[in-house]
Amino acid sequence: MTRFTLRLLCLSAALAAGCAEYKPFDTAAYLRQRYAQEIGAQEAARIAVPFELNAEIRGSLKTLPPLSSELRRINQVNDFIFDGLKLQYSLTPTKDAAETYRTRTGNCLSFVNLFVGVAREVGLNPSYVEVTDLQKWNHREGMVVSQGHIVAGMYLDGELHTYDFLPDRRKAYREFKPIDDVTAAAHYYNNLGAEALLGGDLARAREMITVATRIAPRFDKAINNLGVIQARGGEPQKALETYQRGLAISPGDPTLQVNMARALQQLGRSGDADQLLAKVEAENTTNPFFFIYEADVAIGRGDANKALDYMVRALRLDDELPEVHLGLVKVYLALGDLGKARHYLARSLKLDATNQDALRYAKLLGQ
């Protein structure tokens, strides 16, 4: 045997050994390292990895046949979730991958948590993707609570493909932003905090939102919600400072500005608040959610006709948003026109039969 042949055999053996020892990159462990960099190892150990799978899920995935094509594996993941688990939509609470698998229910982010975990387990490289041109506003007591809309995404042949829980719902999405796992985890905790906030549980809301702001200090949605918690807790000055911090990160963000105006009102600075709200209205002429918010505020102060003006503007911007039609339901109820209220309620439910507010109004109106 020549020296060259011997070297070639040694190289082949080394390569074979390396291939045998290959393991996929542990994204859950890496995310925990990222947590530890921000908040320390001890606290990081208590933070959930939303896409992490347990032994039961991994065992189920072992029954799937291996497939070489990425597209076929993506279809396999969707079939596993929807045909195998028969996942059903449930608005709240947001769940991690393991809990979504266990209950077979979840919302859009719950689905993405499970999709990402399962897809990575079968050798794919999906990511969380934020839909940046759909910024839904949830508001209570004149303040806006921030929640982003997240879908799963993966590049195939250089093109980003996205996967959503409700693919049959009308999609007006145009702008997508893949985000890293730290930001995705912050979205998860922000969702939990927002759900608690909208449900009136300020203690849990503060706990969840604080986690989001600590692991992702520049995550503006969680910063906004922290300000709302402070304002609700009787700390408008702290809330104002929090909104200012958020605006330093995201200048011109309308959600932060609207909430800042509310804090200014609480501090007795009505002139500054009115000036800021006028600026927001001038800059948000294409955002239907802003006009829905303004209509709700107008109803709250007893000006149903002004609320109707706002909702007409929202309807002109997007007549296929269920929230627009639900806003018209509220306006026409305030005006005492039950016929039109029922008409727009039916339209809202046709566009989104899962909308919890619409379902509550349906019960109220006997539909």
List PLM regions with ranges.
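Secondary-structure boundary elements
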Residues: Q37-E99
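Structural marker of alpha-solenoid helical repeat scaffolds
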Residues: I215, I249-S250, A282-N284, L317, ...
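Long, contiguous interaction/recruitment modules in multidomain scaffold/adaptor proteins
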Residues: S90-I223, K238-I249
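Canonical positions in the second alpha-helix
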Residues: V211-A212, R245-G246, K279-V280, R313-A314, ...
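Helix-start (N-cap) detector for alpha-helical repeat units in TPR-like alpha-solenoids
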Residues: A186, D220-K221, P254-T255, P288-F289, ...
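Canonical tetratricopeptide repeat
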Residues: N191, N225, N259, Y293-E294, ...
